[in-house]
């Protein structure tokens, strides 16, 4: 049984972990949510009685999944029986890959397109439908999602509503003809399979006796229905659902927090509702100010080292959009030079990532002495399921002891990917993949050319002909096109 030190967790966190029932955990900002999830997973892994069962953890991003898994491994816990990742990755691996033949549109195979492909398709359709008097953009078309009832389009601009609906329906008709699916269809087809084939639900409920869901406040209706279908079918299945309704930021994309009664109806489980109310990150002034923006009444208490810090809260109503960048530069320099705030403790937020993409690059040019992490920094970050993106993570990180576990896990993904696409003429372990990558030396200053030459050297070392594998070639072309497009911007 997994045990932890006396001061590793606070009483609220321990209560959530030790509870044997299904849990709805409302975790305020800075409350140690990730730490609680990490220890809960480790605890449940130690309780598994069969090597055929898995604990599954659904995270909102792949970065969150990597962080949690790495934390568990650092605790010395074996993660062989843990599956952790996004809901889309879960659906592809456990529902679509083994059962897609039961969907008429997918039974002869399918290709998964990425967000860059979707954008290119929609941009092309927008251009064909636009007129000099009625111009329609890609952003106008981001008003659709799939629910359990099918495609829903919610264009709020009356003058282009009808045309936008035509564009989106044409987009999905084109995907159907090409046997392609996007992230929305991944969810919809997965739901359809579970709805029409109860035996699939039964199989998955036997494999996954315990399901954890992180950031549940941004979960879509289809995602609730997919996980609910699995949980409802099992006899003794349990769920650990974590999030904060006050932090829901994807309502416009269909994400919303279900209340306890709704969750119980969808999953067929009874939940103990618990909370994490201690904020270790912010000052008391910031915590109090947050009360003005709450939509869900919960208790938050600042208890960290910075609880007495005299935060400055200001609202600039006069800066123009043309001068916004200059003002942000001024604020950054003021906080670093005058208030002695560490650069890695400064965060810039915006309503959408697109608002930050150009800004990030401009700030890098104007403040080269500081390191930035944000949209536009990693040109392939939006294509996390691409094989060459996964390989690039290994290529572009140092082979240091501190990164060994993470890079070894990435190498394991490479091995799994190669086997899943039918590359059986090689016999490589994750350690051998790492050794090959570490031994390749490329003398090239241009980033794009460096990666291309590294890819060529890697393929030669592992004896793979990319032109003989449709999957690798398709991902290679898509990866380089996306990379070139970002570098041109």
Regions found by a protein language model. Give the residues of each.
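Helicase P-loop NTPase motor core
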Residues: 269-272, 278-367
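Walker B catalytic acidic pair
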Residues: 215
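Accessory N-terminal region flanking or inserted into the helicase ATPase core
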Residues: 1-26, 31, 35-36, 54-56, ...
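Short, polar/flexible loop-turn hinges at active-site or ligand-entry regions and domain interfaces
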Residues: 50-53, 75-82, 98-113, 128-134, ...
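Coupling/switch/interface segments within P-loop NTPase motor domains and analogous charged loops
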Residues: 104-177, 427-473
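Core RecA-like ATPase module of SF1/SF2 helicases and allied nucleic-acid translocases
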Residues: 344-489
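Conserved RecA-like helicase ATPase core segment
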Residues: 101, 221-222, 226-308
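P-loop NTPase Walker
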Residues: 1-102, 202
